[in-house]
Amino acid sequence: MRTPDAHVIASMEDQPILNAAFNQDSACFAICHNRGFRVYVTDPMDLRVQREFDDGGIGVIQMLHRTNYLAVVGGGSNPKFPQNKLVIWDDLKSKPALSLEFLSPVLNVLLSRTKIVVVLQNKVHVYAFSSPPSRISTTDTADNPHGIAAFSGDTVVFPSRTPGQIQVVDLSQEGQARNLVSIIRAHKSPVRCVTLSADGSVVASCSDNGTLVRLHSTSNTALLHEFRRGLDRAVVYNMAFSPSGSRLAVLSDKNTMHVFDTSASASGAAGAANRRHVLGKVPLLPSYFSGEWSFVSARVQGQHGVLGWSSETSVVVVWISEARWEKYVIVEKKPVEGSGKDQPGCELVREAWRAFKDL
């Protein structure tokens, strides 16, 4: 679809972003607001679809790859659809293709070509993507007001009924036939954020303490890595694996984005690029001196954003609170003469940014 010329695109100053989500490979992302939604190519940022409604806003949105189908839920000051109703929107026909209604608000939606995952505050429903949708399963969860869940490949993860634990469900044909469900005892306090690698083999999670990020295998629940984001309590808003799964970006309310090297095996040495505290090997010191720290980080000017990788070295942030797109790249530092051989090898720098209102 042709991108409208810049001078005819309406300003978003009077329609702040309500939510944003990358598609399954982060090649595109969608934002929703008080009058509709937009779809962009991620990098370079390019507007592809703009839909505005006269009768209300969209509060939750999820793309299905690059198809004409999007999952939407009403939101904002005047929701277009009831907030307990999930609509599969056919943008080619500009009308709903499917809908599902629930007894409580829909907080999150995850899609594949064959499944629809609907997240409520205390339940997760899985449906076959068919007309009409047929329900595959319903699972009770711990209180989940942020709609925390992740879906990749045939694997879906979400908080279990016990705070701090993560439920892993295999949605493959074999997994459904054998009812393959695993529980990961990930944290002592409630889970605040989860994400999956592209193949669904690794889940990254953090609790509402926001100090540690743990990586577990979804096949056997083994702990693969423990990363330290920081020492102070923080709210981790979003995490995302790079396309190969060898790096993990973490965004928190501390105005910092961290990137961890996840390439080392659990049985081997820690990721070569990650740092360790200088006191990490001193006996009898608190555990927060141990563990791996990010190998690059950057100060960011934003609070609530979502992450997507456009390449192995490029991370894009869509800031919901600031209505801004930013691109950060991992680059090699230039050697400083006379500084010795052990200079840091990489840094995370902001390469580009654009405000949505300026399009």
Swiss-Prot record:
Q: Which UniProt keywords apply?
A: Cytoplasmic vesicle, Membrane, Protein transport, Repeat, Transport, Vacuole, WD repeat
State a single Pfam family of this protein. Answer: PROPPIN
Q: Localized where?
A: Vacuole membrane; Cytoplasmic vesicle membrane
Q: Where is the major localization of this protein?
A: membrane
> In residue terms, where are the WD repeats?
186-225, 231-270
Disulfide linkages recorded for this protein, renumbered to the chain, are: none
What is one term from the GO cellular component aspect held by the record? phagophore assembly site membrane
Q: Which GO terms describe its biological process?
A: autophagy of mitochondrion; glycophagy; nucleophagy; pexophagy; protein localization to phagophore assembly site; protein transport
Q: Which GO terms describe its molecular function?
A: phosphatidylinositol-3,5-bisphosphate binding; phosphatidylinositol-3-phosphate binding; protein-macromolecule adaptor activity
The answer to whether the entry has keyword Metal-binding is: no
Q: What membrane topology does the UniProt entry give?
A: Peripheral membrane protein
Asked if the record carries the keyword Disulfide bond, the reply is: no
Q: What does this protein do?
A: Involved in mitochondrial or peroxisomal functions and amino acid signaling pathways.
Q: What is known of its domains?
A: May contain a beta-propeller domain involved in specific binding to phosphatidylinositol 3,5-bisphosphate (PIP2), leading to the association of the protein to the membrane.
Q: Which family does it belong to?
A: Belongs to the WD repeat PROPPIN family.
Query: What is the name attached to this protein's record?
Result: SVP1-like protein 2
